[in-house]
Swiss-Prot record:
SUPFAM superfamilies: a domain/subunit of cytochrome bc1 complex (Ubiquinol-cytochrome c reductase), Transmembrane di-heme cytochromes
Stored Gene3D superfamilies: Cytochrome Bc1 Complex, Chain C
Top-level taxonomy: Eukaryota, Metazoa, Chordata, Craniata, Vertebrata
Keywords attached to this entry: Electron transport, Heme, Iron, Membrane, Metal-binding, Mitochondrion, Mitochondrion inner membrane, Respiratory chain, Transmembrane, Transmembrane helix, Transport, Ubiquinone
The protein's name: Cytochrome b
Keyword Iron included in the entry's annotation: yes
Pfam families in the record: Cytochrom_B_C, Cytochrome_B
Note: Heme 1 (or BL or b562) is low-potential and absorbs at about 562 nm, and heme 2 (or BH or b566) is high-potential and absorbs at about 566 nm.
Family, per entry: Belongs to the cytochrome b family.
Residues the entry annotates as binding heme b b562: H83, H182
């Protein structure tokens, strides 16, 4: 008689995905972020569900309902801060996961990579709408500024913005629909993540060397279940330390003031994980141009498989590409810093140079570096 996990229709799926899955024997801790993202999604859905039980999506009572959660609900403050900082953890894991994919050439699994980009867009949309819900000053003005960017679209822009707002400004209709979308999108993300895994298991995992590993595979369980579990414990320990000791470090103080349409904050800025894209948006002194650059800053990831010129998949043995990769990482840190600064010299020019460098490295320098490295290998 066959083992139940190999014969039962449901267990068989789990078995093929998490137990008997043949996995390269040399994947490093950089491959832990997929499971960590799954953990983040579970944390966010669970904490969000409990918050939704006490939250009111009405302009009059949204802000006070969040205060009520923090003051009167048992451990409401903890659930709220887990959810707020869980978003930051989610994006840290996301960016590290994408960085791993770029460094080790995982983008050559085109279907998996493209579904990953869709997941990134869905997560960014969810996070943006969630940021609006507490109805603080930065929530309101962030929603106003970011949604208003769509008015730059020729001909239909203004109508589109008013359609999204459900009126002539960000108001009750906007808040209600944002709450509805913020609630449903994580489940769509979970379903899309399943498709992401489906495509990944068609090809099998990449590995640090970037070479086929069919000759040296080991079962996922117990080796990588244990490794993932260790990663989860370490990240959860750091995360809970952060939540319990520095819960407001990444938040904006303006969000402790209720939304006031008559009083604009001096510096409107999104959460830290969007600042790099916000800096790219602001570096172009034209509304439509800025919006196009903003979208392209994420969409440019889809070009990685097309721009891969090197004979080797991974950057592990490509020093020129390595240098450019870490320059790109540094550039993203600079863009994140600039996104949080006011629009005045010298920040304007720094942001413009950093934006040009960002696109130059991805679209021009990395493909050229790949060709140069091919030439060096032939010598």
């Amino acid at each position: 008689m066959t083992i139940m996990r190999k014969s039962h229709p449901l267990m068989k799926m789990v078995n093929h995905a998490f137990i008997d899955l043949p996995t390269p024997s040399n994947i490093s801790s950089w491959w832990n972020f997929g499971s960590l993202l799954g953990l983040c999604l579970i944390i966010q859905i669970a904490s969000g569900l409990f918050l939704a039980m006490h939250y009111t999506s009405d302009t009059v009572s949204a802000f006070s309902s969040v205060a009520h959660i923090c003051r009167d609900v048992n451990y409401g403050w903890l659930i709220r801060y887990i959810h707020a900082n869980g978003a930051s953890l989610f994006f840290i894991c996301l960016y590290l996961h994408i960085g791993r994919g770029i460094y080790y050439g995982s983008y050559l699994y085109k279907e998996t990579w493209n579904i990953g980009i869709v997941l990134l867009f869905l997560t960014m949309a969810t996070a943006f709408m969630g940021y609006v819900l507490p109805w603080g000053q930065m929530s309101f003005w962030g929603a106003t500024v970011i949604t208003n960017l769509l008015s730059a679209i020729p001909y239909v822009g203004t109508d589109l913005v008013e359609w999204i707002w459900g009126g002539f400004s960000v108001d009750k209709a906007t808040l209600t629909r944002f709450f509805a979308f913020h609630f449903i999108l994580p489940f769509i993300i979970a379903a899309t993540a399943m498709v992401h895994l489906l495509f990944l298991h068609e090809t099998g995992s990449n590995n640090p060397l970037g070479i086929p590993s069919d000759s040296d595979k080991i079962p996922f369980h117990p080796y990588y279940t244990l490794k993932d579990f260790l990663g989860m414990i370490m990240v959860l320990a750091l995360f809970l330390t952060f939540v319990l000791f520095f819960p407001d470090l990444l938040g904006d103080p303006d969000n402790y003031s209720p939304a006031n349409p008559l009083n604009t904050p001096p510096h409107i800025k999104p959460e830290w994980y969007f600042l790099f894209a916000y800096a790219i948006l602001r570096s172009i002194p034209n509304k439509l141009g800025g919006v196009i650059a903003l979208v392209l800053s994420i969409l440019v990831l889809a070009l990685f498989p097309l721009l891969h010129t090197a004979n080797q998949r991974s950057m592990m043995f490509r020093p020129i590409s390595q240098f450019l990769f870490w320059t790109l990482v540094s550039d993203l840190f600079i863009l994140t810093w600039i996104g949080g600064q006011p629009v005045e010299p010298p920040f304007i020019i720094i942001g413009q140079i950093a934006s040009i460098l960002y696109f130059s490295i991805i679209l021009l320098l990395l493909p050229v570096a790949g060709l140069i490295e091919n030439k060096i290998l032939k010598w």
